[in-house]
């Protein structure tokens, strides 16, 4: 295409996307004389933060995290709480787990059976009647059985009296602790679900029950725990591993820092390390999954599906299924193919991205303080996350114990009514409904505060998202100001002022808090809409038809595209704010027009650079994830012994992997912001100047020559 055929220079396009910048001899980079922008949004933002602090204080007064850390028995007492009779009894035991199959489980959020705190779970099959027979010969049988009874229980009671008083379970069976609760110790034998090598067992009432019935009951309890916000139940694992998680995240931070420093000197070589490392790690994962899948083909029990075994306490059971490893292998193969195809089709653009990264390395070399800034972002994000988690836990555990009537037979007209366990046996309800129990149900209340707790949860989440996006926006604006100062210095480094990052950070806080809050508010609103959409999808999953599922899928896709597009525009708007000091809307408009006038350059440089850096993030997260997996599963010999007795190790593992990726993202975003700022400044440089003696370019000759070679500079600029 010759010059006359290029549509980029037509008047209509200039009219649509604004006039190009003109030469200004006084322009030397970020404007010093500024005024406050988007003041109204700044005031709203500050008021929301004040309200957030007040909410946290109120939640702290009313909440009790022990309710999340410890299970609660039928009397409302905590299991495992220090300084109480249950201090050494850390596990919750269900008298009759089979009752948890009742539909009232999800309706009342409580399994209609007595629950007590125990120090360990049963290890064998034994009924109460069998225990009484053995007790006459050996008193130790009662000593073992009484661990799972109330303190008032006596071994001489008849089975009828036992059922009436509800002092002991009629039968016990091999169990294991899961989420601090005794659940059946399931296993598979020749493709059949068993407990202790048995498929049938005695229920203590003269009947024979199937192990499958226990599986259904266990799944009912798991659904109940989901209804009570299962996320709070992992609090114990976090309490045991928080320092190991911090160590893993610190290692990720150091590793990311090392990569950033190496990018300063060996960007091209390091890219190949990223590429080979990511492809190698994924390839090893595929090979490992294939080996496991092949080995399991010889086991008959491995043909069961995940749906067949349901939700089980023994997580290793899932890794004994062919379906699990086959699914993992397919997912990894898809990821591997996508990465390889992107490397093949983007190989020429990747070369340009590496060149831009090298140029960005020079900028970081002149402004080395930018390598330290991610630590500040990490600290601020950690504060926001910790405050959100603590506030959410205290809100979720606010209230007083609420007790409700539970009738095991389900034939009591007073079922689900509130009651007082201290006087329940003397009330008319106990007489009208023999066998009814007054059990602990949940923590709640009828005060104004308790009525608005769901609203407070929404507010907590929304302000958290707003603060997270504000911290990210603040970092982007500060870094953009520092790198813009570098670019618009004619003689580098002589013309670069002292402390450019500190100056840019101070300007962003002093003058542009409102603009940054405005941009982050837009992102937070979009993210809230996405969360609400996912919540509705979860609640309405059973009532959905094909059309509604299709519409929800379309909405997810649209919101994802919208969020990423707004994030891209926001980043460039923050660059304009850092340079010119205008309000958010004006800066976003100027950035959009500038990008549209240089759309070819954007397509070649921007997203490809992010892809190169994305490989680095994957390598950091993957490396730390492998180490964390070996450590939390006790497969990595270390000087200090790792945490033991975790409910499930993937809680800290996923936290470390996800946190490592976020940390790597924070550090690599320095390079991403550097390249994007240099690119925006370069586009403005081409519009303001023509390379002559009177209007020299600010871009380095090396970068300018490379971009000309790659045909990223209009022909009129070459001449």
UniProtKB/Swiss-Prot annotation:
It catalyses: choline(out) + n H(+)(in) = choline(in) + n H(+)(out). GO terms for cellular component: membrane; plasma membrane. It is found in: Cell membrane. GO terms for biological process: choline transport; phosphatidylcholine biosynthetic process; transmembrane transport. Keywords: Antiport, Cell membrane, Glycoprotein, Membrane, Transmembrane, Transmembrane helix, Transport. It is a multi-pass membrane protein. Glycans are attached at residues 88, 190, 314. PANTHER family: CHOLINE TRANSPORTER-LIKE (SLC FAMILY 44), CHOLINE TRANSPORTER-LIKE PROTEIN 5. Belongs to the CTL (choline transporter-like) family. This is Choline transporter-like protein 5. It comes from Homo sapiens (Human). The gene is SLC44A5.
């Amino acid at each position: 295409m010759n010059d006359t055929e290029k549509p980029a220079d037509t008047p209509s396009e200039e009219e649509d996307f604004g006039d190009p910048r003109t030469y200004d001899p006084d322009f030397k980079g970020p404007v010093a004389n500024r005024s406050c922008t988007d003041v109204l949004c700044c005031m709203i933002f500050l008021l929301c933060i004040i309200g957030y602090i007040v909410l946290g204080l109120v939640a702290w007064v009313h909440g009790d995290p022990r309710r999340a850390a410890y299970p609660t028995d039928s009397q409302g007492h905590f299991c495992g709480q220090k300084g109480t009779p249950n201090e050494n009894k850390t596990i919750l035991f269900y008298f009759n787990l089979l009752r948890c199959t009742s539909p009232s489980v999800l309706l009342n959020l409580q399994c209609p059976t007595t629950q007590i705190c125990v120090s360990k779970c049963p290890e064998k099959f034994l009924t109460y009647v069998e225990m009484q027979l053995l007790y006459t010969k050996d008193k130790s049988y009662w000593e073992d059985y009484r661990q799972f009874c109330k303190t008032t229980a006596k071994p001489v009671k008849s089975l009828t009296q036992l059922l009436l008083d509800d002092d002991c379970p009629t039968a016990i069976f091999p169990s294991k602790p899961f989420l601090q609760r005794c659940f059946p110790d399931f296993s598979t034998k020749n493709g059949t679900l068993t407990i202790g090598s048995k498929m049938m067992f005695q229920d203590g009432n003269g009947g024979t029950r199937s192990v499958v019935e226990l599986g259904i009951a266990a799944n009912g309890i798991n659904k109940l725990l989901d209804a009570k916000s299962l996320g709070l139940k992992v609090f114990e694992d976090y309490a045991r591993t928080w320092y190991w998680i911090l160590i893993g995240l610190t290692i990720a931070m150091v590793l990311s820092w090392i990569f950033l420093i190496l990018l300063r000197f060996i960007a091209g070589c390091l890219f190949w390390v990223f590429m080979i490392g990511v492809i190698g790690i994924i390839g090893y994962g595929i090979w490992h999954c294939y080996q496991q899948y092949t080995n399991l083909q010889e086991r008959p029990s491995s043909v069961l599906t995940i749906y067949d075994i349901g939700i089980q306490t023994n997580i290793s059971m899932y890794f004994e299924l062919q379906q699990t490893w086959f699914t993992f292998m397919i997912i990894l193969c898809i990821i591997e193919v996508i990465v390889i195809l992107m490397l093949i089709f983007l190989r020429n653009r990747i070369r340009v991205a590496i060149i831009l990264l090298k140029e960005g390395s020079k900028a970081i070399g002149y402004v080395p303080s930018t390598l330290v800034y991610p630590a500040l972002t990490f600290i601020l994000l950690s504060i926001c996350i910790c405050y959100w988690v603590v506030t959410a836990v205290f809100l979720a555990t606010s209230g007083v114990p609420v007790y409700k009537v539970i009738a095991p037979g389900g034939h009591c007209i007073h079922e689900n009514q509130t009651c007082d366990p201290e006087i329940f046996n003397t009330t008319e309800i106990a007489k009208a409904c023999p066998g009814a129990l007054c059990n602990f149900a949940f923590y709640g209340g009828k005060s104004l505060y308790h009525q608005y707790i769901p609203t407070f949860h929404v507010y907590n989440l929304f302000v958290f998202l707003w603060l997270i996006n504000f911290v990210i926006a603040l970092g982007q604006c500060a870094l953009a100001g520092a790198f813009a100062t570098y670019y618009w210095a004619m003689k580098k480094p002589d013309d670069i002022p002292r402390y450019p990052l500190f100056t840019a950070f101070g300007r962003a806080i002093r003058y542009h808090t409102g603009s940054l809050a405005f941009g982050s508010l837009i992102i937070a609103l979009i993210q809230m809409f996405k969360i609400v959409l996912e919540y509705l999808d979860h609640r309405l999953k059973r009532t959905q038809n094909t059309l509604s599922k299709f519409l929800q899928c379309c909405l997810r896709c649209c919101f994802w595209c919208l969020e990423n597009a707004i994030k891209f525009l926001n980043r460039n708007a923050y660059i304009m704010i850092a340079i010119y000091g205008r309000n958010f809307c004006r800066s976003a408009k100027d950035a959009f027009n500038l990008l549209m006038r240089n759309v070819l350059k954007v397509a070649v440089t921007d997203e490809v650079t992010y892809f190169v850096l994305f490989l680095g993030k994957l390598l950091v997260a993957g490396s730390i994830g492998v180490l964390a997996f070996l450590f939390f599963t006790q497969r990595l010999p270390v000087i200090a012994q790792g945490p033991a007795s975790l409910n499930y190790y993937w809680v800290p593992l996923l936290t470390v992997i996800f946190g490592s990726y976020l940390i790597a993202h924070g550090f690599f975003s320095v390079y991403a912001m550097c390249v994007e700022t240099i690119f925006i400044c370069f586009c403005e440089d081409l519009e303001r100047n023509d390379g002559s003696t009177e209007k020299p370019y600010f871009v380095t000759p090396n970068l300018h020559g490379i971009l000309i070679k790659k045909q990223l500079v209009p022909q009129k600029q070459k001449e």
